[in-house]
């Protein structure tokens, strides 16, 4: 009868559902199954409350959930970790992120590093962190005062560094690390992975946090970045160019460009409506200079009075921040804020 048929179908559906739940309970590492439970919570607690993907300015470096100011760095505990060096350094939201991955591969398909045959895959990176979080689960779940009593194997897994000391298999789960340095440093921080993720995983935040540890705690980063950091700190730009060359593009336009300080100004004159922040690339890089000149020409043709800082500009620290040197970024940012406050700049145009 119809009633019997409905009962049989209902029984089969219930049996299949129970079998699925038993399977998931027996194999908690089945991430494809767990995302069905976790996706809602991950999206609910997403980084941006307005519903936008987890893109935009990088989050400040935090210790124990509190954003830190490097002016007060001496007040930190001796055991404080800047950035993320082991799985236990991640926040609860970061651990929720990696365990919510659906393994759909959208992030990987859009990643410029992966598509140019670099070892980085946002998907594999997320899965590697997920596997490490599962392996260290007893340590993560234990109370802080009980962790020292755990078995030494568990302690060894929990203390395993995320980034290996040398090159090798990019994703080898060995005592030397969870992933190779090449994986970490292949990221361009473009944000394509975050934009494509259907469950709002913040890949870039996690990558930059691991870079911060490598730079600020382990002092283990590519040699090329050493030159970058020194140039920004000493010369005020990533390429080590002289500050006097910031005005070179002005000689290539056929209209006057006012430069702050050339007439002895202490602050932006009242007749100047906008300060044009040219930036390092806009002042030194040939292709970017074309954009700088085009914007200046548009302002001139529109009759807008504007002024540039010229030699008074310095790097905003963004390259250092993307590379994990949060200390250098904050130093550059505070220097620029001080300059802009001194000259009383209220309207700024950037490209």
Report residues per predicted region.
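Acidic, Ser/Thr-rich low-complexity segments on the non-lumenal side of membrane proteins
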Residues: 56-115
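Short helix/loop capping segments that flank catalytic or ligand/cofactor-binding pockets
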Residues: 36-39, 46, 54, 110, ...
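Short, well-ordered loop/turn and helix-capping segments at boundaries between secondary-structure elements
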Residues: 30, 39-46, 50, 113, ...
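Generic recognition of flexible, low-complexity loop/linker segments
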Residues: 3-14, 23-26, 90, 96-99, ...
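Membrane-embedded alpha-helical bundles of multi-pass integral membrane proteins
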Residues: 1-76, 83-84, 123, 127, ...
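Short acidic (Asp/Glu) and glycine-rich catalytic loops that position anionic groups and cofactors
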Residues: 17-21, 104-108, 187-191, 206-207
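Iron-sulfur-cluster electron-transfer modules
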Residues: 89-98, 120-124, 133-351
């Amino acid at each position: 009868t119809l009633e019997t048929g409905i009962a049989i179908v209902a029984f089969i559906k219930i049996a299949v559902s129970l079998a699925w739940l038993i399977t998931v309970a027996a194999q908690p590492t089945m991430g494809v199954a767990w995302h069905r439970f976790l996706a809602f919570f991950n999206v609910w607690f997403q980084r941006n409350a307005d519903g936008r993907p987890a893109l935009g300015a990088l989050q400040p470096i935090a210790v124990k959930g509190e954003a830190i100011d490097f002016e007060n760095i001496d007040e930190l505990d001796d055991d404080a970790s800047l950035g993320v060096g082991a799985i236990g350094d991640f926040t609860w939201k970061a651990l929720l992120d990696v365990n919510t991955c659906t393994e759909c591969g959208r992030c990987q398909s859009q990643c410029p590093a992966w598509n140019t045959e670099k070892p980085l895959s946002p998907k594999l990176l997320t899965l590697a962190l997920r596997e490490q979080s599962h392996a260290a689960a007893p340590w993560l779940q234990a109370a802080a005062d009980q962790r020292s009593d755990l078995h030494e194997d568990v302690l060894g897994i929990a203390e395993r560094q995320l980034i290996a000391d040398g090159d090798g298999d990019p994703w080898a789960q060995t005592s030397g690390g969870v992933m190779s340095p090449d994986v970490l440093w292949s990221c361009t921080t473009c944000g394509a992975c975050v934009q494509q993720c259907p469950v709002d995983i913040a890949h870039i935040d996690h990558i930059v946090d691991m870079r911060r540890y490598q730079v600020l705690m382990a002092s283990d980063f590519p040699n090329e970045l050493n030159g970058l950091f020194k140039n920004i700190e000493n010369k005020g730009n990533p390429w080590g160019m002289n500050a006097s060359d910031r005005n070179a593009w002005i000689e290539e336009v056929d209209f006057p460009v006012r430069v702050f300080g050339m007439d002895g100004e202490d602050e932006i004159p009242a007749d100047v409506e906008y300060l044009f922040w040219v930036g390092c690339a806009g002042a030194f890089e040939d292709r970017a200079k074309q954009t700088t000149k085009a914007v200046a020409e548009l302002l001139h043709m529109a009759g807008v009075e504007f002024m540039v800082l010229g030699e008074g500009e310095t790097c905003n620290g963004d390259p250092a921040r993307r590379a994990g040197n949060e200390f250098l970024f904050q130093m550059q940012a505070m220097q620029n804020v001080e300059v802009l406050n001194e000259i009383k700049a209220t309207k700024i145009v950037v490209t």
